[in-house]
Amino acid sequence: MLKVCRESVQREPEGVQSRIQLVQADMRSFSLAQSFKLVTTPFRTFQHLTAVDDQLSCLVSIHRHLVEEGTLILDIFNPSLEALVRDNLGQEFGDEPEFTTPDGRRVIRRHKIVSKDSFNQINHIELLYYVSHPDGREERLVHASPMRYLYRFEAEHLLARCAFEMQQVYANYDKSPYGSKYPGELIFLAKKVKS
């Protein structure tokens, strides 16, 4: 992902490039030499932390890097009870619209749940990428990883334990109020408070 991001940054004007610093680090414990007004955890990255201690360590590291009253935007999915109990292990689902890359490849992304650990709230998932190359070659790429799902009040409790104060919870990136779309997203806006 950093490679793709670096390529994207190189296409930006010099003034933008000079303000961007890419850092590869462990989100559970990182140390940068600066503080920020805003920290985001996009694309459900927080849910790849499958142990509560790791989640707390991550939030403590983020807290340490925010200025006083800085904002954290935490993005996770809102677990659908119907989906959690569905007997769909090994079945592909979630057709997303096909997209075309700049080099002409057509890509369809799907999902698959390989195993479920309901007691620890962990699904082992695969993201499947079906790629059609301009030369006619077909390719299937698989990215496997565990994802721990959290419910709203569990996430709020973790944030409170790490000295964050809830400001808002949204159901989507369009700022739809929580509960207006189900299952939707859980997007938390939390403010750093003194620990």
Where are each of the predicted segments found?
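A short glycine-rich, Lys/Arg-flanked "PGG" loop and its adjoining helix->strand segment in the class I
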Residues: 54-71
